Amino acid sequence: MSNRFAVILAAGKGTRMKSKLYKVLHPVCGKPMVQHVVDQVSQLGLQKLVTVVGHGAEMVQEQLGNVSEFALQAEQLGTAHAVDQAAGVLANEEGTTLVICGDTPLITAETMEALLQQHKEAGAMATVLTAYIEEPAGYGRIVRNENGHVEKIVEHKDANEKELAIKEINTGTYCFDNKALFASLSKVSNDNVQGEYYLPDVIEILKNEGHIVSAYQTEHFDETLGVNDRVALSQAEIIMKNRINRKNMVNGVTIIDPSNTYISADAIIGSDTVLHPGTIIEGNTVIGSDCEIGPHTVIRDSEIGDRTTIRQSTVHDSKLGTEVSVGPFAHIRPDSVIGDEVRVGNFVEIKKTVFGNRSKASHLSYIGDAQVGEDVNLGCGSITVNYDGKNKFKTVIGNGVFIGCNSNLVAPVTVEDGAYVAAGSTITENVPSKALSVARARQVNKEDYVDQLLNKKKS
């Protein structure tokens, strides 16, 4: 197999997005558009990948890191001009170069591989990825001769009436012989309505020089969708969401209502897990097998063990063990580690806490900046008082501790193994192992006080 290279065009300003965010960095199913493209082309066995950047170059470089080399297009003078900026990296290379736009997040490695194979089998100097659509307005048209061979590509604004009737369109993805590509770029003119240097003109240049120009028509037009505004962004989101949901269902995940379930492109979900409506799984989340998630649950960048149930709750940047029960209406905040067989019940908030195996906080509790041992029971209304208005402090609760209802643990404080804290206590000092700590005012009953009070009011 000859050397393979790729150029991703990501220099456009994206003015139609009307956004401060650089166009190709707008996310689709939680991942920037250009990252989707890079992830797919990286499966093609490339020797070099060059991303052409312009406006917002630093942000794109930060996103892609060392996966790609970069070339700067300081002025946006057209797609041919953009590709020519990669000459410093690729011009002297021999092989095949794939050119693709960074705003086509739905393209797949399979389609690009088919394009590369067509290019090789045809012995072509250039091969264009085309599609057939009923309403081709806005797209460049593929002009073929009487033998069906590609003659040229005409941009919509430059097309005559006959060419506008053509329904085979240019998707903006190409293969070129690398040396032929860079030799032809200097011959491209900007004598057109837009006054730009069009990459499709290279097709006509190579054809006129007697080279073979080929085309590969894809049946998957949705893969070629270019995102230029928020409407197209929403369309790409829907298509990608359906693709991700289908992949998970094929792999054994039950999704009760796919139209109302959102899974990020990088999430991994085990078989026999059930996702209820309103579930949103974001980032690099990993969910085990036999779990039940939702309804109306958000999980972001977290690891969820097997046989765990999360209902109507939010989990961010945390790790949950096996057979954990969360919710309804619980909030597990970042940097929390929840052990196995744990119960985090309704209206419980946990933040930056290690919560040991088989421990329970069943309702109405806040546990922050804490280390909770195994087999601990936190009664209703148990609170770790971790903040003094300036600094955060740690609470340590040992194994087998019982915390009574409506108790405050004022950090920094330690409740040692096996200790009990009486309901209604405010604990400000360490509690020794197996001690009972009572920190509340003694109850006083005033006999017949109510009758005396009522009689006093009548008089």
Swiss-Prot record:
Chain spans, region N-acetyltransferase: 252-459
Keyword Acyltransferase: yes
Region described as Pyrophosphorylase: 1-230
Pathway: Nucleotide-sugar biosynthesis; UDP-N-acetyl-alpha-D-glucosamine biosynthesis; N-acetyl-alpha-D-glucosamine 1-phosphate from alpha-D-glucosamine 6-phosphate (route II): step 2/2; Nucleotide-sugar biosynthesis; UDP-N-acetyl-alpha-D-glucosamine biosynthesis; UDP-N-acetyl-alpha-D-glucosamine from N-acetyl-alpha-D-glucosamine 1-phosphate: step 1/1; Bacterial outer membrane biogenesis; LPS lipid A biosynthesis
Catalytic activity field: alpha-D-glucosamine 1-phosphate + acetyl-CoA = N-acetyl-alpha-D-glucosamine 1-phosphate + CoA + H(+); N-acetyl-alpha-D-glucosamine 1-phosphate + UTP + H(+) = UDP-N-acetyl-alpha-D-glucosamine + diphosphate
Source domain of life: Bacteria
Region (Linker): 231-251
GO molecular function: glucosamine-1-phosphate N-acetyltransferase activity; magnesium ion binding; UDP-N-acetylglucosamine diphosphorylase activity
Biological process according to GO: cell morphogenesis; cell wall organization; lipid A biosynthetic process; peptidoglycan biosynthetic process; regulation of cell shape; UDP-N-acetylglucosamine biosynthetic process
Gene Ontology cellular-component annotations: cytoplasm; membrane
Main location class: cytoplasm
PROSITE patterns registered for this protein in UniProt: HEXAPEP_TRANSFERASES
Catalytic residue positions: H363
Cofactor: Mg(2+)
Co-factor note (free text): Binds 1 Mg(2+) ion per subunit.
Pfam families referenced in this protein's UniProt entry, alphabetically: Hexapep, NTP_transferase
Compartments, record wording: Cytoplasm
Enzyme Commission number(s): 2.7.7.23, 2.3.1.157
Binding-site residues for Mg(2+), renumbered to this chain: D103, N228
InterPro entries (UniProt xref): Bifunctional_GlmU (IPR005882), GlmU-like (IPR050065), GlmU_C_LbH (IPR038009), Hexapep (IPR001451), Hexapep_transf_CS (IPR018357), NTP_transferase_dom (IPR005835), Nucleotide-diphossugar_trans (IPR029044), Trimer_LpxA-like_sf (IPR011004)
Job of this protein: Catalyzes the last two sequential reactions in the de novo biosynthetic pathway for UDP-N-acetylglucosamine (UDP-GlcNAc). The C-terminal domain catalyzes the transfer of acetyl group from acetyl coenzyme A to glucosamine-1-phosphate (GlcN-1-P) to produce N-acetylglucosamine-1-phosphate (GlcNAc-1-P), which is converted into UDP-GlcNAc by the transfer of uridine 5-monophosphate (from uridine 5-triphosphate), a reaction catalyzed by the N-terminal domain.
Record protein name field: Bifunctional protein GlmU
Organism from which the protein derives: Bacillus anthracis
